[in-house]
Amino acid sequence: MTSLAAFVGAALMEIGGCFAFWAWLRLGQSPLWLIPGMAALALFAYLLTLVDSPLAGRAYAAYGGIYIASALVWGWAMEGHRPDRWDVAGATICLIGMAVILFGPRPAAL
């Protein structure tokens, strides 16, 4: 699995898992929503371990850009809120930051 696939899968699992809690606490859905929500959050954590990075902190920092962009897509697809130009600009800045973290030149040891 590539790092990008792991990041995207992790984002879907984290957003879906967190949305289960949102649905329960904010939308009045059944607490049974927590069962798939917790499973999704566990899968999210597992998927981040598949990222090609020797450092957890670096993997998590890079993941942040994917998470932000994915959350905006989720809001559009699942909640009907189309991202505005500021959402898109902010996500673009985050994705550029993610690329710097992942692909910036550094010594081979780290």
Swiss-Prot record:
Keywords: Cell inner membrane, Cell membrane, Membrane, Transmembrane, Transmembrane helix
Localisation per UniProt entry: Cell inner membrane
One GO location term (cellular component): plasma membrane
Domain of life: Bacteria
Keyword Ubl conjugation: no
Predominant localisation class: membrane
TM regions (residue ranges): 4-24, 31-51, 59-79, 88-108
Lipid bilayer topology: Multi-pass membrane protein
Keyword Cell membrane tagged: yes
Pfam families in UniProt: UPF0060
Similarity comment text for this entry: Belongs to the UPF0060 family.
Protein name as catalogued: UPF0060 membrane protein OCAR_5428/OCA5_c25530
Species name: Afipia carboxidovorans (strain ATCC 49405 / DSM 1227 / KCTC 32145 / OM5) (Oligotropha carboxidovorans)
